[in-house]
Amino acid sequence: MQTSAMALLARILRAGLRPAPERGGLLGGGAPRRPQPAGARLPAGARAEDKGAGRPGSPPGGGRAEGPRSLAAMPGPRTLANLAEFFCRDGFSRIHEIQQKHTREYGKIFKSHFGPQFVVSIADRDMVAQVLRAEGAAPQRANMESWREYRDLRGRATGLISAEGEQWLKMRSVLRQRILKPKDVAIYSGEVNQVIADLIKRIYLLRSQAEDGETVTNVNDLFFKYSMEGVATILYESRLGCLENSIPQLTVEYIEALELMFSMFKTSMYAGAIPRWLRPFIPKPWREFCRSWDGLFKFSQIHVDNKLRDIQYQMDRGRRVSGGLLTYLFLSQALTLQEIYANVTEMLLAGVDTTSFTLSWTVYLLARHPEVQQTVYREIVKNLGERHVPTAADVPKVPLVRALLKETLRLFPVLPGNGRVTQEDLVIGGYLIPKGTQLALCHYATSYQDENFPRAKEFRPERWLRKGDLDRVDNFGSIPFGHGVRSCIGRRIAELEIHLVVIQLLQHFEIKTSSQTNAVHAKTHGLLTPGGPIHVRFVNRK
């Protein structure tokens, strides 16, 4: 299959075709500018890590008169205590809470060991900003070794998420042409609205099967299928049937592979804490990791190859070829077929659960805060109407809908933390951080700090509406999509999917709690997920 697909792509490219411009055209873009590094050279003999733990307490905001401190002086949990937190007290599902716990105990910058890994954690808005602003043209992410090892083992290319350096720069420069800016993604409004129409039909069906005629149980599962259908519509330029009564078997197999990927997060973390030479004695985590990736790549390859055949069919009949992202990738010749397989696989993986979890939390918060829901609904009716089907052009007319998404992501950031590897020596929080040190940016902790967001534990979407200098929001306190050149490239797709579906859900339904609605707390499974099923009532608007 793969060989024939490569031959087919070669035939298409030999025809000298280029993407048709009517889908938005190509945007020119040069390489990102390199910020000036904020660094300092290490003194002779300095080490990148020290296994002893310093005393609890917040370090000074800047260097002392005698110069910055070494990592040996940095506070943090002792190695055995840290391992006990994760292995004995289920810390893998509480990573977001452990961020806050360690920040209270050791201050806003602290070190820790997790098996062979040494990490400096940062839970301060200004320090996070310093790290991100000091990044070069190709920032290096942390903890992607297992992804790259799998690709080397199977002879697969890396995608945008797993690539580094010049390879990452090349891929981003290609993909950014079609999905990085709002106006690039706006052309997909029609496709997304078709998926939303199917979602609303599905809600009506599920309601009819409930005793009260209104409750939909486990909206997490419903929004997972919506997100998968929506992302795939853009990536593959085809529908998967996720919202049908009978889901196609190929799609079912992909869902199973995706669920395996996230369900094995804890075992993957166990494996990360154990040296590689021990893997033969505990083979299951790595074996399951590879099996799930095999399923994800298989699914993507089938759909990519189907699109290739469709393009060839059109060419054979003398038709002009045009299309969306995948068609552009084929015809631009900017990526190899293997790189196309890798990128669509990684982007679908990254886009499904991130969108579905955020949408589940949004509906949960609206159900529990009817006064907020009513305010948002009034804005929609006033500015768009009760039944107007919105497009991307309508979203700026409803700023509260955008504020709702920002506030949901502040309270429940999909990624509770982010990783970086320092590319220069940096002085952060009064400590000298050597080049090559792994950093953990604690976004969950900064999102809940009152100095960043007054009354931080409260759900207040209006805080994101700019009103002069009152209640101003500092973006580095909550950056759910990241910052700079390594920020989430699928951000605009996720925002489009969520903004449009929230508007239409509120146009059709009043979202309420039901007798089955329980308090739902967050858990970490790689991503920040609802710790249990979310049940709500979708009541017809009168």
From Swiss-Prot:
Annotated Gene Ontology cellular components are: intracellular membrane-bounded organelle; mitochondrial membrane; mitochondrion
Transit peptide located at which residues?
A: 1-80
Instruction: Name any cofactors this protein relies on.
Output: heme
Q: Which residues bind heme?
A: C488
Cited InterPro entries: CYP11_CYP27_families, Cyt_P450, Cyt_P450_CS, Cyt_P450_E_grp-I, Cyt_P450_sf
Q: Where is this region: Disordered?
A: 20-75
Put simply, this protein is called Cytochrome P450 27C1
Keyword entries, A-Z: Heme, Iron, Lipid metabolism, Membrane, Metal-binding, Mitochondrion, Monooxygenase, Oxidoreductase, Transit peptide
Gene that produces this protein: CYP27C1
Which is an annotated GO molecular function term of this record?
A: 11-cis-retinal 3,4-desaturase activity
* Hydrolase recorded as keyword: no
Q: In which tissues is it expressed?
A: Widely expressed, with highest levels in the liver, kidney and pancreas.
Return one Gene Ontology term, BP aspect. retinol metabolic process
Record field: compositional bias (Low complexity): 32-46
Q: Name one Pfam family in it.
A: p450
Enzyme Commission designation:
1.14.19.53
Task: State the family it belongs to.
Answer: Belongs to the cytochrome P450 family.
